[in-house]
Amino acid sequence: MKIQYSYLKNFLNTKHSQNRLVDIFTQVGFECEAEEGVIEFDITPNRGDVLSLKGLEREFYAHQEKKSNRKLETYKLNSIKDHKIISQTDGSGCGNYHLMLVEGLQIIKNLDAKKRSFIESAGVPLIHPLVDLGNYVMLEIGAPMHVFDLDKLDLPINVQFPKLKNNSLKVIGGDVKDIQSSSLTIQDQSGIQAIAGIIGGERSAVSSNTINIAVEAAFFKPETIVNQARKYGLATDASHRFERGVDPEIQ
């Protein structure tokens, strides 16, 4: 995992140099090295909890025997009464599943340059401003998010294993994948829209014309996601984190 030094320094609220931070995280137990303006961390598979700025902050302050005074901001949203958003969630594969509907967005061309630089330096490709914003949140707090074009969904959503055989999904990027019965899926009333915790389908992907969205935040159980990405030949930033386990309390 690569993290821009300037972002990490500000998030930790420290004046330490880049090399000093490398020394501290090495003492904590992480293999890391400094590159030009970036620190690369070699995170072992059992430490998925540190694949974010928030995770690194926790380790940093534990080493300093101090407590961070940073708190995640919470917002009170208007309740949605007109939609039945989620119909069914398979508890054996999904601990919790949330969708937030946002309507009437103003179309933006790009995130600001600072956020784009942070995302790119982490090795995450820039795709679309809405997707990029979700990836920014993932890098900050460790929670992968997926953004659907709301107008392309036929609500409500079901989170379940496929009940029918011969399912296929054209995933983002254009490849068509035959969906296995062992794969947890996100389905609307018209069919499969995403392979849970791995990748979304092209049919419900956001575009330059998107103005209404459904933002997914979920805890997919690691045992449900592990090895699934490999079966499909897909290695995504989301699957990398869900396989290792994300914090179910931050959704």
Question: How does the language model describe each region?
Answer:
Residues 1-251:
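RNA/tRNA-interacting regions in translation and RNA-turnover enzymes
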